[in-house]
């Protein structure tokens, strides 16, 4: 079992979420975090790691990175600035998705017939209540 030092992956980012795998059929599960990071101070999503910090790896990291990029571009409005990086942890391939603090807030998740914005508060992702 490979337990990771998260700070080695995300550097200066103080906010992050860990995902064991990319949820292709349920992109809202991780797109909420992308919206929340863009609407607040930015942050990182690490794919291929357990909640306890164990490096599990991804079977198709390159394909997953492409799907992440396409999903962000098709499901978030406006499209937030982000960066994808690969990280090899003792033979286990991980993806680190850095989402930068947005200038054009709010950043909405669009899918499942809804348009929702999220924010990050105390390590939790919350739906943002917007005034009309």
Question: Which stretches of residues belong to each language-model region?
Answer:
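Conserved N-terminal catalytic/coupling substructures associated with nucleotide/phosphate chemistry
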Residues: 1-132
């Amino acid at each position: 079992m490979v337990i990771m030092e998260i700070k080695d992956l995300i550097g200066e980012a103080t906010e992050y979420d860990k995902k064991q795998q990319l949820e292709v059929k349920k992109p809202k599960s991780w797109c909420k975090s992308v919206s929340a990071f863009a609407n607040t101070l930015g942050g990182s999503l690490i794919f291929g790691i357990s909640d306890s910090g164990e490096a599990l790896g991804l079977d198709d990291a390159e394909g997953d990175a492409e799907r992440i990029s396409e999903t962000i571009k098709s499901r978030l409005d406006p499209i937030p600035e982000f960066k994808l990086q690969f990280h090899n942890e003792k033979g286990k391939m991980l993806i680190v998705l850095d989402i930068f603090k947005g200038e054009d807030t709010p950043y909405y998740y669009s899918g499942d017939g809804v348009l929702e914005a999220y924010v990050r508060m105390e390590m939790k992702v919350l739906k943002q209540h917007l005034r009309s």
